[in-house]
Amino acid sequence: MISAQAYGENGKMKEYHYTGPVEHKFSPYAFNGGTVLAVAGEDFAIVASDTRLSEGYSIHSRDSPKCYKLTDTTVLGCSGFHGDCLTLTKIIEARLKMYKHSNNKSMTSGAIAAMLSTILYGRRFFPYYVYNIIGGLDEEGRGAVYSFDPVGSYQRDTYKAGGSASAMLQPLLDNQIGFKNMENVEHVPLTQEKAVQLVKDVFISAAERDVYTGDALKVCIVSKEGIKEEIVPLRKD
């Protein structure tokens, strides 16, 4: 029931007076969830992501992987604001085509990482809301992982997780691959089969606890034979 105090003597609704100026806020960003992960081995690299695209408590798509093939030896994983992910990958793909036409060869993983750093830094005052991880092979055929922050700072890692479930995945990777703070443990070289199984296991665990991660897992395995893809189902609730 509407109170009679809201109306004046002429029957029209009174104007409300605010104590200060009214601000019209607009946020150009949205967080669309999702998790990406990359692991580098002796002669291979793995980049994996889930396929859920969500915002708040709404799921926009169950088939939106966040792994993008850039060259035959490089895969980009990015999560954050999906619009910025699409824009950024289109810019990178255009730069790669220009480089190939000019030099008659594909850009290496390290060169792509350096290029991506300059692209992100160029937008530092209005940054892309994207967390990027590059996985691939370096010039010597060894696995390489490069992780970035939104404004272009990057470093080479052996393994890295990013996105909504990164706080859950990174400690598991530290334990199983990095052997952090572990004594009397034999550091066995990571095989491709073990790495793939580990990636599947940690994503299955993350999907149990993170509402923004789920539906399916896309795994891209980069080796000298090329890029092999696998799809693993995750929980869909």
Swiss-Prot record:
Main location (coarse class): cytoplasm
Protein name: Proteasome subunit beta type-1
PROSITE patterns: PROTEASOME_BETA_1, PROTEASOME_BETA_2
Role description: Non-catalytic component of the 20S core proteasome complex involved in the proteolytic degradation of most intracellular proteins. This complex plays numerous essential roles within the cell by associating with different regulatory particles. Associated with two 19S regulatory particles, forms the 26S proteasome and thus participates in the ATP-dependent degradation of ubiquitinated proteins.
Subunit-level organization: The 26S proteasome consists of a 20S proteasome core and two 19S regulatory subunits. The 20S proteasome core is a barrel-shaped complex made of 28 subunits that are arranged in four stacked rings. The two outer rings are each formed by seven alpha subunits, and the two inner rings are formed by seven beta subunits. The proteolytic activity is exerted by three beta-subunits psmb5, psmb6 and psmb7.
InterPro entries listed in its UniProt record: Ntn_hydrolases_N (IPR029055), Proteasome_bsu_CS (IPR016050), Proteasome_sua/b (IPR001353), Proteasome_suB-type (IPR023333)
Gene name for this UniProt entry: psmb1
Family: Belongs to the peptidase T1B family.
CDD domains: proteasome_beta_type_1 (cd03757)
Stretches assigned to coiled coil: none
Knocked-out gene: effects: Morphant larvae have a strikingly smaller head compared with controls, a mild degree of edema surrounding the eyes, and a significant decrease in head/body length ratio. The eye size is significantly decreased in the morphants compared with controls.
Subcellular location as annotated: Cytoplasm; Nucleus
